[in-house]
């Protein structure tokens, strides 16, 4: 989309590149206004000489010009509809079902900011915002001092004050108006003459928009190379500056020693180095070498803009201004590979390569991308039916690339040649060439989709109908993962690498997710709240586990309804041995130990028969005879005694103790 620009200049003798020659009849009112120009003041005559350069939009298919972007887009829809009708007609003649070629329906890409938009109406509304932004940036430039002004009134006041002060005493005599020329005959629309397109970088003229775009692509490649090699040149310049400073110090020291020894003139000793190309003199050989490299090098002709701090040269003032930000804001260095970047955002994007991060992942193939736009463009490759299909069999997801490709079948340029008229009708209509045979379609046995290749069919069955595969395996332990980024994170468990460090406590982690989860403990944020009791948690998994405490046991009428509780987080942990459900994994683990112990006892081999244990000893009865707290006698017997016999034994023992003898019991008595 062409950018809307308004420029202020004198009435040119030739048309600017890209303008259209148009002649309009001069009315009587305009003749009267032209005769009154001689009575204007110099400022009014200067203000009346302003003109606005009007840009038009050209159709990339037929070269037609339109004043607004809406007219161009509506006109290009006719080309798309004509192509779709022609393809449908050819397929009906062969006997095949017409293949739907999408026209205006589908995502469109903005040429200014590369944003994807779904409908033409939204695209027009989106590009109107760009037009309003560009319209607010119109400025008027003085052709003598190159100063910019936001309004024509300020521009006229500037011209009166600065550049017309010398001619105020003598008012300029306006040139006589040329006599009115007869109106030329109206030219047919097909004979519109187009001026060549001029490149703003190198002023190269191109005949067609396609050649102009191809030529500008070379400047983009050189710009990328310059930005890529800019840091290397800065490092080399810094090293050379250090060497030159050392040489300068050595030469100055030698000059001082020579002056002291010889006693020469100090005024001529410091200017001994002269430049061979210009009359300038330098104080040392290092300064002379630096002067010749910046002023007389071959690159100085094509890079006239020089940096005052590092003496680097650039081809445009915009690149010099962008380079100056590196001196103002400082450079950003990578701590891993010591690479230097001008912006902090570029350094952050570079650090993701070391960390192996991929913020946007494709769910079909597991590839990671740094931006959402690249992921959306990649996702189109997994679709079964592409948006745009050419007759030659090539498919395109971008409408602009599809239109550019179609021109290769018709010729170099899509615009008609200058002065060309409508081609004469052929005497005999030639039959259209037969369309190429459509590629073989492989239907999916599980759904109604069909694919042109076996690889796309297998990818579709694996992604849609098959179980989740773990195609990426660890080379150390053989564990499988769904995505490649998971393998990279898993390898850190083998290497012991923990590159993510907490700035608050210094603790390191193996993944960025674990670091983010840990940082919540320092901030005190608990974003997950229970709706029943109001308790807050730092992680959603802890909240889900806490929610099970509020759930009541559910009774089912039939046994087959019991496993459904696992789907609704009622009791998600199930024992496969006895069929019991548990709300926590810890309870399931404790329960499984019971089954493990039972299996251990069952699997133990039978022991050999052991000898019979000896009979237990006969029970003995102990009788203690006491008097006044003192033990008189202890009687042990293997048979229980009656109360009368026990009293007799105690009296006998008491009498024996008084007599000073021993009591002997007869076994027959006992």
Swiss-Prot record:
Keywords: DNA-binding, Epilepsy, Intellectual disability, Metal-binding, Nucleus, Repeat, Transcription, Transcription regulation, Zinc, Zinc-finger
Biased composition (Pro residues): 171-189, 423-442, 606-619
Basic and acidic residues composition bias: residue spans: 217-231
Effect on the protein of changing residue 409 to Q: In DENNED; uncertain significance
Expression by tissue: Widely expressed.
SMART domains membership: ZnF_C2H2
Keyword presence, Oxidoreductase: no
Cellular component annotations (GO), alphabetically ordered: nucleus
Xref: InterPro entries: Znf_C2H2_sf, Znf_C2H2_type
Zinc finger (C2H2-type): 57-79, 108-130, 140-163, 197-219, 305-327, 332-354, 360-382, 388-409, 442-465, 472-494, 500-522, 528-550, 573-595
Domain of life of the native organism: Eukaryota
Major localization class: nucleus
Entry GO MF terms: DNA binding; zinc ion binding
Region of interest (Disordered), ranges: 168-196, 217-304, 409-443, 601-621
Cell compartments where the protein resides: Nucleus
PANTHER family, sorted: ZINC FINGER AND BTB DOMAIN-CONTAINING, ZINC FINGER PROTEIN 358-RELATED
Disease: Dentici-Novelli neurodevelopmental syndrome: An autosomal recessive disorder characterized by global developmental delay and impaired intellectual development apparent from infancy. Disease severity is variable. More severely affected individuals have profound intellectual disability, axial hypotonia, peripheral spasticity, prenatal and postnatal microcephaly, early-onset seizures, brain imaging abnormalities, and are unable to walk or speak. Patients with a less severe phenotype may achieve some developmental goals and show less severe intellectual disability.
Role, per record: May be involved in transcriptional regulation.
Family under the similarity heading: Belongs to the krueppel C2H2-type zinc-finger protein family.
Name the record gives this protein: Zinc finger protein 526
Originating species: Homo sapiens
Gene expressing this chain: ZNF526
């Amino acid at each position: 989309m062409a950018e809307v620009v308004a420029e202020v200049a004198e009435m040119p003798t030739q048309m600017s590149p890209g303008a259209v020659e148009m002649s309009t009849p001069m009315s009587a009112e305009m003749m009267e206004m032209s005769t009154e120009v001689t009575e204007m003041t110099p400022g009014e005559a200067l203000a009346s000489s302003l003109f606005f350069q009007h840009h038009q939009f050209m159709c990339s298919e037929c070269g037609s010009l339109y004043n607004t972007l809406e007219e161009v887009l509506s006109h290009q829809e006719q080309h798309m509809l004509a192509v779709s009708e022609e393809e449908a007609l050819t397929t009906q003649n062969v006997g095949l079902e017409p293949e739907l070629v999408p026209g205006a329906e589908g995502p469109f890409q903005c040429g200014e900011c590369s944003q994807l938009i779904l409908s033409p109406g939204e695209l027009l509304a989106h590009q109107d915002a760009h037009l309003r932004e560009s319209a607010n940036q119109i400025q008027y430039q003085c052709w003598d001092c190159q100063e910019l002004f936001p309004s024509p009134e300020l521009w006229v006041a500037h011209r009166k004050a600065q550049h017309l002060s010398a001619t105020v005493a003598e008012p300029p005599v306006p040139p006589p108006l040329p006599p009115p020329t007869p109106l030329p005959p109206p030219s047919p629309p097909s004979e519109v003459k187009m001026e060549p397109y001029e490149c703003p970088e190198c002023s190269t003229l191109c005949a067609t928009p396609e050649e102009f775009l191809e030529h500008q692509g070379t400047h983009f490649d050189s710009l990328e190379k310059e930005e890529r090699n800019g840091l290397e040149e800065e490092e080399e310049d810094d090293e050379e500056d250090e060497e030159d400073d050392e040489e300068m110090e050595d030469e100055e020291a030698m000059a001082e020693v020579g002056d002291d020894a010889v006693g020469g003139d100090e005024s001529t000793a410091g200017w001994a180095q002269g430049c061979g190309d210009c009359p300038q003199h330098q104080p040392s050989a290092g300064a002379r070498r630096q002067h010749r490299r910046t002023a007389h090098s071959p690159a100085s002709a094509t890079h006239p803009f020089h940096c005052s701090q590092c003496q680097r040269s650039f081809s445009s003032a915009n690149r010099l201004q962008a380079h100056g930000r590196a001196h103002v804001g400082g450079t950003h260095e990578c701590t891993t590979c010591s690479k230097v970047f001008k912006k902090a955002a570029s350094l952050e994007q570079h650090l993701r390569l070391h960390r192996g991060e991929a913020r946007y992942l494709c769910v079909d193939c597991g590839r990671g991308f740094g931006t959402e736009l690249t992921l959306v463009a990649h996702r189109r490759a997994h679709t079964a039916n592409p948006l745009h299909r050419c007759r030659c069999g090539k498919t395109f997801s971008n409408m602009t690339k599809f239109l550019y490709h179609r021109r290769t079948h018709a010729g170099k340029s899509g615009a008609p040649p200058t002065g060309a008229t409508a081609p004469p009708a052929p005497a005999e209509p030639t039959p259209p060439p037969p369309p190429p045979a459509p590629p073989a379609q492989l239907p999916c046995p599980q759904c109604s989709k069909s694919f042109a290749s076996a690889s796309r069919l297998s990818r579709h069955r694996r992604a849609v109908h098959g179980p989740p595969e773990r195609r990426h395996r660890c080379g150390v332990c053989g564990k499988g993962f769904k995505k490649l980024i998971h393998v990279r994170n898993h390898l850190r468990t083998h290497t012991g690498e923990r590159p993510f460090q907490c700035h608050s406590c210094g603790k390191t982690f193996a993944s960025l997710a674990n670091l983010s989860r840990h940082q919540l403990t320092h901030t005190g944020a608990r974003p997950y709240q229970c709706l029943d009791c109001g308790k807050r948690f730092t992680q959603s998994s802890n909240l889900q586990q806490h929610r099970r405490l509020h759930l009541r046991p559910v009774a089912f009428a039939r046994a087959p309804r019991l496993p459904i509780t696992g789907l609704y987080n009622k009791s998600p942990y199930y024992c496969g041995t006895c069929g019991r459900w548990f709300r926590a994994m810890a309870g399931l683990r404790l329960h499984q130990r019971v089954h493990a112990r039972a299996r251990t006892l069952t699997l133990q081999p039978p022991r050999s028969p052991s000898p019979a244990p000896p009979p237990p000893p006969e029970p003995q009865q102990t009788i203690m005879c006491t008097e006044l707290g003192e033990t008189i006698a202890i009687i042990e017997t293997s048979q229980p005694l009656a109360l009368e016999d026990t009293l007799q034994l105690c009296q006998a023992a008491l009498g024996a103790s008084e007599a000073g003898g021993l009591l002997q019991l007869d076994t027959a008595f006992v």
